[in-house]
Amino acid sequence: MELLIMIDAFKRASAKSVTAVIPYYGYARQDRKTTGREAITAKLMADLLTTAGANRVLALDLHSGQIQGFFNILVDNIFATLVLVDYMKKKNFKPEELCAVSPDAGGVRRARYFAKEMKCSIAIVDKRRDKHNEAIAEYLIGDVKDKNVVLIDDIVDTAGTITKAAN
């Protein structure tokens, strides 16, 4: 709410342009209906930011690419994996000692990017959910034995997914 108020204040003070910088896009996981009578809150947030007067949004690791399509203004989706890759390269990690692991199928693209840039192997945890926010790691696809594992995820909420993937 404070971001919306600030954007409105800037526009009322004759700001030529306002870029909303959003490190964490709240409600990003509500990007589609999963049951009847459910709001698509990620779209509502996009509408509110636009109505408040934002001309551009700079976001970090949006949960899904379709969120960019919810806006009628420019959206830059910056990937934190770029920073991680840069750090790992500077620390001279050996590719044969690393394995990029996605804790679920939805994060494979991020893990694949990291693996490609670091020239290392990749693994994927096949995750299922039995209840809301309760993940169960079922199978590991790939080999992580004797590797330094880099678990790559976009949102850590309860840390259930990433903890179970690590175990």
Model-derived features with residue positions:
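PRPP-associated nucleotide enzymes
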Residues: 1-167
